[in-house]
Amino acid sequence: MAAITAALVKELRERTGEGMMDCKKALEKAGGDIEKAIDDMRASGAIKAAKKAGNVAAEGAIAVKTDGKSAVLLEVNSQTDFLALQDDFKNFVAESLEEAFAQKLTDAAPLIASREAAREALVAKCGENVNIRRLVRVEGDVVGAYLHGNKIGAVVVLKGGDVELAKNIAMHVAASNPEFLDASEISAEAIEREKNVFLQLNADKIAGKPGNIVENMINGRITKFKAEASLKEQAFVMNPEVKVGELAKKAGAEIVSFTYFKVGEGIEKPVDDFAAEVAAQVAAAKQ
């Protein structure tokens, strides 16, 4: 059995990120064999990762890579924004993005499978749940991408135009988050819902007004809704005097598609109620 020196403990700590006492115990259990200690700690980490799998990971980062003809947009989640700013997490995201782009992956499932060992190692080291949530790959004549910090990302596919135009429109998408490409994609159901919402919110204003006046008010709201919801009808953020669709048309381009990712979008975060938690603990203690 090799002597458990301070230098050996320090090396194991640097290689694993675990605490000094944990490293010392692992080395003692492994008979001073640092590689075996690492294997044992990874095995222990895998168990720890499984226990944390139920924790809600709603923070994280968006990453994007493009070559002008294709792009991959990726979301990786963590439990806290603090972890999302750490190098270990950033490296995991970057390596995952590179793999997805190089292998031309169109779905997150194969990436999740191939990155599972690295994910478990990261979870074991940081003590937080980490998940590869989703990815999208797009291809086209011209592809542009924009990343706002590490929280919002967008990609745009054009037919015609250039990468700079596609990037500028992607920046607009990141800022405005349109629901549809153009007004023709808006379903009758969506329009009916908007109409009903308008009527409910303005019941007092329209009470007693002639039917044609009410109809004009509804039509005005629906027109505004279509402009707000569809990318081509929105005022371009860099020049509100022109619509996004007009901008593309003037450049000899057609917007084919867009994709928008925001960290944690659609993930329900738990709401901690400290008072309720204490009350529950007191009630349990009385039983």
From Swiss-Prot:
Cellular localization per UniProt: Cytoplasm
Molecular-function annotations in GO: translation elongation factor activity
Chief localization: cytoplasm
Record GO cellular component, one term: cytoplasm
Segments of this protein annotated with the region Involved in Mg(2+) ion dislocation from EF-Tu: 80-83
KW Protein biosynthesis (keyword) present: yes
HAMAP family for the chain: EF_Ts
The protein's name in its UniProt record: Elongation factor Ts
Species per Swiss-Prot/TrEMBL record: Pseudomonas putida (strain W619)
Encoding gene (name): tsf
